[in-house]
């Protein structure tokens, strides 16, 4: 089980990403289309003024059951350990153990 503080920190990051996503995307689009180096410098400064945790690449996928940060399957949002347990118990519809 992950520390509660780490799980809460990830939730806070998710909220910040949601809050600033439109502004960040608008600034990045303006940065891509602008030709003037001075304007690009100003836009870059504005992007840097945004909160650091509002960048989407600061987020970490976590298991929604245990909060484990590594070994998380995107399709289920579960860590490999929980996925294995639940699959063996038949709690994941359509998931079967492979054999050949």
From Swiss-Prot:
Entry-linked InterPro entries: Ribosomal_uS14, Ribosomal_uS14_bac/plastid, Ribosomal_uS14_CS
Superkingdom as given in the UniProt entry: Bacteria
GO molecular function annotations of the record: rRNA binding; structural constituent of ribosome
GO biological process: one example: translation
Gene3D superfamilies registered for this protein in UniProt: 1.10.287.1480
Assembly information from the UniProt record: Part of the 30S ribosomal subunit. Contacts proteins S3 and S10.
Family: Belongs to the universal ribosomal protein uS14 family.
PANTHER family assigned to the protein according to its UniProt record, in alphabetical order: 30S RIBOSOMAL PROTEIN S14, SMALL RIBOSOMAL SUBUNIT PROTEIN US14M
Protein name per its UniProtKB record: Small ribosomal subunit protein uS14
Organism: Trichormus variabilis (strain ATCC 29413 / PCC 7937)
Organism phylogeny: Bacteria, Bacillati, Cyanobacteriota, Cyanophyceae, Nostocales
Gene label: rpsN
């Amino acid at each position: 089980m992950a520390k509660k503080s780490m799980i809460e920190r990830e939730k806070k990051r998710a909220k910040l990403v949601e809050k600033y996503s439109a502004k960040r995307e608008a600034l990045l689009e303006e940065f891509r289309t602008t030709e003037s180096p001075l304007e690009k410098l100003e836009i870059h400064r504005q992007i840097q003024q945004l909160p650091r945790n509002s960048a989407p690449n600061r987020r970490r996928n976590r298991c929604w059951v245990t909060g484990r940060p590594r070994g998380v399957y995107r399709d289920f949002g579960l860590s490999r350990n929980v996925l294995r347990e639940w699959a063996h118990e038949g709690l994941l519809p359509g998931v079967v153990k492979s054999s050949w």
